[in-house]
Each structure stands twice: as C-alpha cells, then as structure tokens.
Amino acid sequence: SSPGINLKEPRLTISVMIQPDVYHKGFCTRKKEIVKTSGHHARFLMCQPTSTQGTRIITGDNYSSQYQELFDKRINELIDESLAMSGERRCLHFSPQAARIWTDYYNDVESKLGGLGPLRHCREYAAKNAEYMARLAGLLHHLSSEEGDISPYTAEMGRELAIWYGNEYMRLSNPLTFDNTAQNETMRLIPE
C-alpha cells in the first residue's frame, strides 16, 4: 500500500470514442437505469456526428494542412499560457448582455423540466445544460483569445453548442430515436 496522493483543484477531461453498437449494448440496455440515475451520462457532452466515410477523397486540390497548423499553433500557445500561469486561475465573467442570454436560457430549460414538460424524461441532463452553456462560452472566449468579459455573441455560440449537445444526448440516450431523424425533430431541447 502506497501513501495517498493529494490533488488540489483537480480537473479531468475525458474523451471516449466508441462504436454505436458498443455504446447501445453497454449503456442503453442492461446498465441504462444505473447510468441514468447515477447522473453519469449527464456529466458528458455526448455526440455522434454524421459519418463522412466514403466522401473523404483526397486530391491535390482539396487537401491543405493550413488549418491543422493553425490549430496546432493555438494549442501550443494555450499550453505555454497554462504553464506560465503557475497554477493561477483566471475567472471569466459574462458581460451584462451575455448574462441575460444565460439567464433566459436557464429559465427556458428549467420551465421544461417539471410535470409534463418536454424535458421531464432527461432532467438529469437538462438541469446541467445551462452550466454547460456557460462552460462552452468560456472555452470559446479563451480559445479565441477574447479579452474582457464573455460577449453576447460568444454566449449565443455557447448556447447553440449546449442545445446541439442536449439534442444529441436525448437522441443517443433513447434507443427509439437513435438514427430516426423524423422523431428527433420532435425532441428538440429548445425549439427553433
């Protein structure tokens, strides 16, 4: 037995990439209720983007590493910034207009959780969705090197991402709507 490890203010990011069949057999059948009631799934931003297999043909005209190089450069800048901060935390705030966007979003989602509300079957996730919106807006703010408070535009982008991930959660956690576009449209987290 080794001595314990003391972590101060730990952060954890997990990226799990599994095939749909493994996901549905592992999480949506026998373990579904345990996973759902424990809130495990609700702590993840889940998605299954449309496959591009069969369309990823590379020709001399359509291949460029330009965006990969820009992405790599930005990631390295973020790593350098993080190391330079020596554990200091940067606290982000919404501008007054962005805070209003967040509040309106929170209230809209909250109003759909109760009784016969459209989000009553995914309360465990929807209750956290406004928090995800704030975190996503903060990430976008930081990644794009914005200064000052989080802008209304960035808050709206965070909201749109939170809505998209919320809809993906509902689609992926319900085998009846998995890969059923017609039914998906009726299960929108926030109607368009």
Predicted regions: what is each one?
Residues 1-192:
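Phosphate-handling catalytic cores of nucleic-acid transaction enzymes
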